[in-house]
Amino acid sequence: MFKKLHMKIAVFVSIMLIITVVLLMLSSYLTLKPMITEDGKNTTQNVTQSLEQNIELQLKSYAISLSRLANGELTHTFVTKPSKEASRLFHDDIKQIKDNDDYVAMAYIGTAKKEMFTYPKADFAEDYDPTSRPWYKLAAETPDQVVWTEPYKDVVTGDMIVTASKAILDRQKVIGVASYDLKLSAIQSMVNKQKVPYKGFAFLADASGNLLAHPSNQGKNISKDQTLQTIASEKKGIQDVNGKMVVYQTIGETGWKVGTQFDTDQLMWISDKMNRANLWISLIALIITIILSYFLAKTITGPIQQLIVKTKAVSAGDLTVRAESKSKDEVGILTRDFNLMVENMKEMVEQVRLSSGKVSDTSEQLTAVAAETNETSGQIAKAIEEVAAGASEQASEVETINEKSESLSTKIRQIAEEAGGIKERSKSSEDASYKGLDALGQLLMKSNEANMETKKVETMLLDLENQTKNIEEVVTAISNISDQTNLLALNASIEAARAGESGRGFAVVADEVRKLAEQSALSTKHISETVKLIQLETKEASHAMVEASRMNDEQNSAIHETGEVLNTITAEMQSLVQGIDHIYAEIQRMSEEQLAISEAIQSISAISQESAAAAEEVNASTDEQLVTLDKVKHSTETLKHASQELMNTIAKFTL
């Protein structure tokens, strides 16, 4: 299954995506937790700060009101110059303060003279000394500031009360202290109603560690808790208390601590919820991506698989195949170049097949002509041998006549008989000469035809050699394309290796392209070797045809010379026959003209010797011609064999 390129791409993309998802989930988990923790801290800090500002703002409003009362002219006049009018105005003032704010439990003044004035009116013991009370002492110690006492529970109402005090000064001398008893219920309600995220809550504690506001432990003192002691000693901060995140801040000069608390597990619950949501989203995206990558890989590798099938068909010799691709990427370019290569190969093989057919036909014709020429030359050689034999015999007889010319008178009858024999043999020689001329004419005609066919074959071989050179150039171009494709695939593999894991899919595609280029290179090499073999055999055949042409030229020259000799022999034989006839007619006068006869016989002897020599030369030329014809025949057979092998090679291709 993993031998398929599209499966490799799909599996590779899936593995990379799984690794990416795992890394993203791990990164999300590792980064989300501190981010959520930090966000929780920031949120609760903002809540705590807002709560602290609201409480401080409320306390400050009471401090401003109390400062106005303590520093007011009415209060100063009431304390330093008491009168009914001053008392009335002062009481109206504090009454208005009390009536306008339900959280002011009581407004009052204690003087240095140990007098006590309150609203609402309250009864005090006769020995009650306001200057001995904590609220008075604190204000007297810091006359320029509003001071706050520790909160306490009202014994009558049960409400938590805090007293704010401000010294009344006269020439920088404390003459009294103005105070408000404030109900903390408003602040407690504000704290208890404060919404804190992550299922948290707000709390308020005084400087002694008493919880003024808390959803479950209100009124409890937590000053003995070591962790909370750290909170009490610092102005503000964040503490992790038993898995609870506590954010706290000090309120102004009161020393109170307002804070918020939430469970850190709630932060992790949100983180886990987000991680689970991310996990499901990642799984769905992973499945969709795997499916899409599978079909994308099929889309990419489909044209390559088609091209592999077409390449195998071409390597098997089928040049009718064509690959289809409408894309304009590298695969599309490779497909179009493949189709162009197959088309060019088809045209070249077709041309080679046609040329091979012509060469084969011409070779057969040349073989037939060579066979006929060889047979005719054999007949000529036989005739020339007969002529040579007759000429030799004639020379011998003439020599005998010459030797016995002295006894011609006594052997006239024998001379007459011999003359008759000479006449008959002369006729035979004349007939043989005419036959030799006819045979020589046939030989010349066949030799010319053979020469013409040889020229045609030589021309065709040159054309074939040029065609094979064209094939070799195209094959070289194809080989260069394969080498370039292989080099590009190698470069793509190097670039993919540089890209690391993200480039591994491109490395696999590049490796497949490189293998395809190597297969094309092997096929091209096989074609190149076949073409080189054809070129070698064509060159050998061409050289043989050139040699045959040269031999034909020499043969034609020898035939012309033989024809001239035969014409001479024929003419001489005609003269010889006429002479013999004359001898035969004048035999009765031979004795009277013996000297003339002797001279004539010597002349005949010389001519006979020349005829014998010419016949031997013709015979030798004929033998050479036979050898040449054998070579021509052998060359044509070699050419025919090479043409047949070429046809068999071309037959492997389907056009």
UniProtKB/Swiss-Prot annotation:
Gene Ontology biological process: chemotaxis; positive chemotaxis; signal transduction
Mod. after translation: Some glutamine residues are deamidated to glutamate by CheD and subsequently methylated.
Statement: the UniProt record of this protein carries the keyword Cell membrane: yes
Residue ranges annotated as Cytoplasmic topological domain: 1-8, 298-655
Domain of life: Bacteria
Ranges for domain Cache: 148-225
Family of this protein: Belongs to the methyl-accepting chemotaxis (MCP) protein family.
Protein name: Methyl-accepting chemotaxis protein McpC
Native source species: Bacillus subtilis (strain 168)
